[in-house]
C-alpha cells in the first residue's frame, strides 16, 4: 500500500463547484483521486517546462484581474526587466474585471521560464500558460 498524507486546503466555493462537476463528468470515485491526478499533471507539466534548454520562441499568456492593486504596473515592470526576450505583447480586455496579455518571447529557455515564474507568482494573476516552440530549423518535415 502507498503511504498517504492527509492535507487540508481552502478553495473558493465557485472553484470547488466547478471541480466537483469535472469529477462527476470524468467518473472519479472521490475528490482525493481527482486531486491526485491534478497534482500529477501539474508535476509533469513543471518537469517538462523545466527540462527545456537552448534557444526557444513562444508565448506567455496571462489572465489577470486588472483591479488588483498595482498589478498592471508590476507586470509592466517585470516585462521591462526581460525586454531582451520580449518580441511583442498583445493586450485584450476580456470583461469588466479581467484582462489577457499575450507576450511573444524568443531567447534562452531558462530565462523564458524565469520570466514565466515571475509573472505566475504575482498576486492577482489568475492563470499563466507558457507555450514554447522548437526553433524552425529543428521542425521535422
Curated annotation (Swiss-Prot):
Cofactors required: Ni(2+)
Q: Which GO terms describe its molecular function?
A: DNA binding; DNA-binding transcription factor activity; nickel cation binding
Say which domain of life the source belongs to.
Archaea
Q: How is the cofactor bound?
A: Binds 1 nickel ion per subunit.
User: Where would one find coiled-coil regions in this protein?
Assistant: none
**The keyword Transcription belongs to this UniProt entry's keyword annotation:** yes
Per UniProt, which keywords does this protein have? Answer: DNA-binding, Metal-binding, Nickel, Transcription, Transcription regulation
Listed under GO biological process in this entry are: response to nickel cation
Q: Tell me which residues bind Ni(2+).
A: 80, 91, 93, 99
**What exactly does this protein do?**
Transcriptional regulator.
**Per the similarity annotation, which family is this?**
Belongs to the transcriptional regulatory CopG/NikR family.
Q: What is this protein called?
A: Putative nickel-responsive regulator
According to its UniProt entry, this protein's organism is Methanococcus aeolicus (strain ATCC BAA-1280 / DSM 17508 / OCM 812 / Nankai-3)
Q: What is the lineage of its organism?
A: Archaea, Methanobacteriati, Methanobacteriota, Methanomada group, Methanococci
